C-alpha cells in the first residue's frame, strides 16, 4: 500500500482548547484528505491545541487495512475524512465518542456506528471545458457509457478509494444491483481510465488528460476556484450527498489527543473554514453553506443507504475486481 507521512511542528496553544500535558503533545492521524487540504488545515489544529500532528495520508481502503493490521498494537489515534460506509463496515476497529458539540450536528448526517460525520460530500462529474462543448457534457450516469467518451473518463479504483466506492454505490442505487444494473455499469466501466488516487482525478481533468472525471464536489470546486478550464455537472438522474467520516481508533495510544482532534474538526471555526475555503458542505446546523455551489435543494439527490453500502461492500468489490480482471 502507498502511504505518505507528514510531520508537522506544534504551534502555540490558544484559549480555545486546554493546553495538553507532555504525554498528549503528539496525535497520530490517518487521513484520505489530499495534501493541499492537510497543509491548509493542520496548522489551524496546532494553533488551537498546541499539539504536534503526525499524519499518514493514504486511500480510504489502505487506511482501514493498516488500522486492522495494527489492531494488536494501534499506532493511530484518529481516522480523519474517509468514506462513512467504510467506517460503518469496520465498526469494531473504532472507539465510540460523543464530542462536545454533538448536538450541533445535523441529524441527516449522523451515523449509527462508532464513527462521526466530518463534512458533507457530493458526488459530481467534472468536465474539461476545452475538450468538451456544453452540448457534449454528460447529463446522466448512463451517458458515461456513450462511445465518444471511450478512454476519456477518469475514475479512481473503487477498491482503493472511498469516494470511488460511493460513486459505484450511487450508480447501483439508481439502477439497481441486479444483473441489469451491473450490466449498465459494465458499459460505463468500459470507458473508464482508472487511477489509484481519487485526488488525481480532478487534476487529470484540469490538465486535459481526461475530458470527464468522477469526483467529489469539493475537489472539483478547488479547480473551478483556481480558474481552471473546468465545470461541475450534477447528474440529472441523481447523485449522493452524504457525510464523510472520522473516528477514534480503538486502543489509540493518545485517546485524549484523538478526542481533541475530533472536537477541533467539529468546531464552528473549522467547519466554516472547510466550507468557505475548501468547498465542502457543512454538517453543523449553524454553519453557512458556500454560496458559489448549487443549493442542494436544486440537486436531484438519492437516498444513500450507508448501512447497505457497508454490508454489500465485499460483494460489490468481488464484482468490481471481476470487471478489472476482464479488461
Where are these regions (language model features)?
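Mature extracytoplasmic/periplasmic domains
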Residues: 249-305
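Short alpha-helix C-terminal cap/hinge motif
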Residues: 40-54
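Periplasmic-binding protein-like
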Residues: 107, 121, 184-188, 193-194, ...
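Extracytoplasmic "Venus flytrap"
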Residues: 25-41, 56
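A bilobed periplasmic-binding-protein/Venus flytrap-type ligand-binding module shared by bacterial periplasmic
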Residues: 124-131, 172, 243-254, 273-274
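Extracytoplasmic ligand-binding site segments that recognize negatively charged/polar headgroups
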Residues: 32-39, 61-62, 68, 75-209
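An extracytoplasmic/periplasmic, membrane-proximal ligand-sensing/linker region
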Residues: 178-180, 282-327
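A ligand-binding cleft/hinge motif common to bilobed small-molecule-binding domains
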Residues: 85-90, 206, 211-229
Amino acid at each position: 500500500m502507498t502511504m505518505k507521512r507528514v510531520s508537522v511542528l506544534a504551534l502555540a496553544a490558544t484559549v480555545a482548547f486546554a493546553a495538553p500535558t507532555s504525554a498528549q503533545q503528539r496525535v497520530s492521524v490517518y487521513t484520505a484528505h489530499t495534501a493541499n487540504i492537510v497543509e491548509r488545515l493542520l496548522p489551524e489544529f496546532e494553533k488551537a491545541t498546541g499539539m504536534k500532528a503526525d499524519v499518514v495520508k493514504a486511500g480510504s481502503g489502505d487506511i482501514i487495512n493498516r488500522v486492522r493490521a495494527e489492531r494488536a498494537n494501534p499506532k493511530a489515534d484518529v481516522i480523519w475524512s474517509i468514506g462513512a460506509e467504510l467506517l460503518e463496515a469496520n465498526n469494531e476497529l473504532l472507539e465510540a465518542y460523543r464530542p462536545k458539540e454533538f448536538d450541533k450536528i445535523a441529524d441527516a448526517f449522523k451515523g449509527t456506528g462508532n464513527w462521526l460525520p466530518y463534512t458533507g460530500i457530493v458526488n459530481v462529474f467534472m468536465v474539461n471545458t476545452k475538450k468538451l462543448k456544453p452540448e457534449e457534457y454528460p447529463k446522466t450516469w448512463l451517458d458515461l457509457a456513450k462511445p465518444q467518451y471511450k478512454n476519456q473518463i477518469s475514475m479512481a479504483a473503487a477498491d482503493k478509494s472511498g469516494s470511488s466506492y460511493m460513486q459505484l454505490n450511487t450508480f447501483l442505487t439508481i439502477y439497481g444491483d441486479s444483473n441489469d444494473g451491473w450490466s449498465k455499469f459494465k458499459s460505463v466501466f468500459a470507458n473508464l481510465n482508472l487511477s489509484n488516487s481519487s485526488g488525481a482525478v480532478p487534476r487529470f481533468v484540469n490538465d486535459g488528460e481526461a475530458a470527464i472525471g468522477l469526483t467529489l464536489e469539493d475537489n472539483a470546486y478547488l479547480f473551478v476556484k483556481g480558474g481552471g478550464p473546468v465545470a461541475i455537472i450534477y447528474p440529472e438522474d441523481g447523485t449522493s450527498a452524504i457525510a464523510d467520516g472520522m473516528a477514534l481508533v480503538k486502543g489509540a495510544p493518545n485517546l485524549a489527543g484523538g478526542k481533541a482532534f475530533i472536537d477541533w474538526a467539529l468546531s464552528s471555526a473549522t467547519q466554516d473554514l472547510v466550507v468557505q475555503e475548501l468547498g465542502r458542505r457543512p454538517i453543523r446546523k449553524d454553519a453557512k453553506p458556500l454560496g458559489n455551489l448549487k443549493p442542494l435543494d436544486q440537486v436531484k439527490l438519492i437516498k444513500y443507504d450507508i448501512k447497505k453500502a457497508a454490508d454489500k461492500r465485499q460483494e460489490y468489490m468481488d464484482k468490481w475486481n471481476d470487471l478489472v480482471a476482464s479488461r
